[in-house]
Amino acid sequence: VLPLRLEELTVAGRGRWEVRGEKLSVRLSGVDPAPAYGDRVVGMGQLRRPAVPWNPGEFDFAAYLRRLGFSGELEVDGRTGRWERRSSGHGTWLMASALRMREWIGEAVTFDIGDDPERAATVRAMVLGTREKTPPEVEAAFVGSGTMHVFAVSGLHVGMFAVILWNVLRLFGLRRGLVVALTLPLVFFYVYITGLRASAWRAALMAAVVMAGPLWNREGNLLNGLGGAALVLLAVQPAYLFQPGFTLSFGVLLALALLHRPVLRLLAPLHEPDPFLPKELYTARQEAWFWLRRRVAESLSISVASTLGSAPLMIGYFRMVTPVGLVANLVLVVLSLCILVVACMAMAAAALQWPLLTASLNHANWLLAAAGIGSAKFFAAVPGGHFRVDPSRLWRGSVCEVTVLALDQGGSAIHVDTPSGRHWLIDCGGRRHFRRSVQPHLEMAAVNRLAGMVLTHGDSDHAGAAELVRGAFGAGRVLGGDGGEELRAGSAHELDEGVVLRVLFPPEGWEAGVADDRCAVFMLEVHGVRVLLLGDAGFPAEKHLSETGVDLRSDVMVKGWHGSDHSGLPETLAASGARVVVVHRSHFPPSEDPPPGWQRRIAECGMQEVDLGRSGAVVLRLRPGGVELSGFADGSRLVLPSTGSVGVTVTGIAGRVE
């Protein structure tokens, strides 16, 4: 993926468009060598709007590109389309220099440790902020330990880099003005080569105020510096206001400014010496002990204040609370500082062309990176050290939310969030769906652990991600699938109080050669509302249900498509009586396209269709009074009052027939 500033655009059948200066995000494949910064190129490809998220929790790439000023997305395949480099050297000198320096630093700080990708990627991420080659489990460990700001370049790293430069230059006896004049350009250049992050800009601007202020007899003030940095950044780029990095960075610093001293006063018993012992009588050992206690208390107060400041924002953005970060930051911030110091020494050795010293320093950083990864994994594994919370539970009431995810190519996953907060997953999609859709949705839904997972049948697009789901979210019970509890028609499973999942199909002893013919069919009953989950059941299953008189009455039907047979039979639709049917229309694969006559059948039954391909994920909110359906992508909304037609079994004494 690379940004492209347009000079000319010609659209097939529409001629040339006036687009000079507009930016496109280009996805390249089959192009070797890849274009470099400043190349003038001519290409042919598919121009489109960036895809919007279809499921809750998915990354909104379209909004991200809009904030960065991109007008659209271009996909180019060099094997079938045209991609030609005309000339080079058309970029700015500053950006070209920054990119060359970034590449040189990446090679210098990982010299001789590249055979360990995990540690090398960690060092590179902490020094340069590049996370492309970082294993997902390493990132997850830093997120779970509440130390992600330590892992990726942030305002913390810029501040540490400024302190390192300041102290090194002061060792040479230079005057303050000269030290400031040398330090600040290097600090801003570091911000430039590490990606121009809002938090890094904030730290650089505040460092400039703190360092340069005394030259004009001005004392630094944290709140003034914070406000000034915010004013400058928002004046240059107002879109920063909508970036989590910006609000988290400024929110944490604001909390530090307001809460650090009050928290330190509360910790006074931990660090203040005996007031009746004169300082003149301190021994060297006591002085060292009091100094250490003071530093620990200050570090702890900073950690507490920053955690309190970031907690509301972390809940709002990521549904995450990390109390273990109070302690983890004390360890990992020190390790991060050590890694940055050693990396600066390695860069100096590489610049002097001392490969042996460079390799030795990088091996020291390898050990520090290993300690950092190990510490992050240890703190992330502490029970209760991090957990997800959903603030909407404070006001949503006794609602059962059923989210039917919109997954491509026949994938299926349905998330059931019961009134008391128990989470169940009915099918889990394929492996390709997990990181893109299923995992982000469950994280945004504040799932700490699944109460259970139900696997309807052995289709890789329905159950392929089962192991990934279990590894990330656990599962108290597993119904269906290999090693799970058997799904048998007539059985009922209570997912929560008042939330029942009844198995309608398959019956005991059912034999079928195709996986879709063994697909389980369920009736979900909540608050008197019934949702029929037909899955990929086809002709044999639907015929069996209609011939055996199984009660299919429901308010909403959720239906997939059989991979090779007819489904959606008229008798099934009529027996259901559902007012809404949720399906996913797709032209690929062909089996995911509705069969001929489908629209006529549902019209004859008075059903309204909700297409996941248009609405995105559909959220069903089941209440005692009925069900509300809302589309995630298109914002559609439909409210159905409950019919109250719930199948029951009664026992009593018959009276006289009138």
Predicted regions located by residue number:
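Core dinuclear metal-dependent hydrolase active-site scaffold
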Residues: 131, 234-235, 242, 376-452, ...
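Transmembrane helix-bundle segments that form internal channels/tunnels in multi-pass membrane proteins
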Residues: 83, 168-178, 254-407, 413-422, ...
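Di-metal (Zn2+ and/or Mg2+/Mn2+) metal-binding site signature of metallo-dependent hydrolases
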Residues: 147-172, 448-473, 534, 560-571
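Hydrophobic alpha-helical transmembrane segments in multi-pass membrane proteins
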Residues: 74, 134-325, 366, 370, ...
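Divalent metal-coordination and catalytic microenvironments
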Residues: 45, 126, 154, 195, ...
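Active-site environment of divalent metal-dependent phosphoester hydrolases
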Residues: 158, 198-200, 432-433, 458-464, ...
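Cap/insert and terminal regions of metallo-dependent hydrolase folds
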Residues: 358, 542-617
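Membrane-interface helix/helix-cap signal primarily in integral membrane proteins
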Residues: 1-149, 389, 436-440, 449, ...
